[in-house]
Amino acid sequence: MNKIIAVVGMCGSGKSVAVDEFIKRGWKKIYFGEATFIKMKELGLEINEENERKTREMLRASGDKGIYAKIFLPEIEESYKKGNVVIESMYSWSEYKIIKEKFGDAFEVLCIATDAPIRRERLKTRTHRPLTEEASTSRDYSEIENIEKGGPIGIADHYILNNGTMETFQKEVIEYIESK
């Protein structure tokens, strides 16, 4: 039976690194964040943390915190028929419930957990969209308070702690993927 796994965690925890390991093993990636960037382009907004946050929140401001799951549900369904699917940037509890209701036990959540000081340090030095400590803290608060991010993290089926080396983390992610 094919699987759908959403990789969740706070910004800077290592979600993208984990998702890359799924892709290397033939999983189809569906990136919810793509909808944010498409909308930003439509609005003529520069890609930066402030505009990303405003756009994410605007898309959900209609009162539909499950909007990203609804946007991508047809692609998830089609991809699932063909093979395994990994979802990146599923944030909200509403998104989780929509996907869980549709796919049941075929859907799981993998949470990448990293201590906040380690995440903030990594975010300062990452090459793609680095964040200051202030911006990182602001994003944490915004995602927890405004987009229900804690739900999927709290109910995850499996957790991987990413406080150590890249090598150790990748090994644990690979072991998890291979167990599926």
Which residue stretches match the model-derived regions?
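Short, well-ordered beta-strand core segments
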Residues: 29, 108-109, 158-161
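Conserved lysine of the Walker
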Residues: 15
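ATP-dependent small-molecule kinase phosphotransfer cores
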Residues: 28-86, 90-98, 129, 134-135
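Hydrophobic positions on the alpha1 helix immediately C-terminal to the Walker A/P-loop
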Residues: 18
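Small-molecule kinase domains that catalyze NTP-dependent phosphoryl transfer to phosphate-bearing small molecules
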Residues: 66, 124-179
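Conserved phosphate-donor/acceptor-positioning beta-strand/loop module used by diverse small-molecule
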Residues: 88-89, 102-127
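P-loop (Walker A) phosphate-binding loop of NTP-binding proteins
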Residues: 10, 22
